[in-house]
Amino acid sequence: MTAANACRDHHQRRGESATAGLQGLSGGEGAGAGQDGLTGPQSVTFRVEGMAPAPQGSKDWLPNGGMRESCRNVKPWRELVALEAIAAKVPLMQGPVRMSAVFLFQRPANHYRRDGTLKPLNPSLVSATSREAPLFHCVKPDYSKLQRSTEDALSRLAYEDDARIVGGSCDKRWCVGDERPGALITVIPLGGG
């Protein structure tokens, strides 16, 4: 099921038009809605788990002269983000928004000791050493391409268009503890119309 179809089905089950988006829902209903005064009562935080984040942006030329995304996981990633946003009851926010994401990646075997325990973390490392493992994911894909695929996935679900995003932050890091590959995403309305 595509993200657009999932969105349409979601609104039809609720008796809303597909263009109404999720406007009728308050951010307080969504999982992880912010109430701390910093993110505001309408902010929503949700988790996407089940696959590694996929970059969007690089293209491959086809023999017939056409182009396609270099990463074949872009479409499934965008659909998973959209489905999780719907499940979290992310409202369709009007006006400018801020979007933040933490992208999580599965650690390779060299981040672990022989007994299977994670090596001590060192935030300044780029790659694993014999004694320590890095915290941050300093290898491809580029964070800007991950950000692009995730922002596009939330268009018409969390905001009308990703042009409404006026700020935010993105981090890439390796999973720690029982975390699974995916992302932790927060969308914050900044008011206005």
Per-range role (PLM):
Residues 2-193:
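Acidic, proline/glycine-enriched N-terminal capping motif
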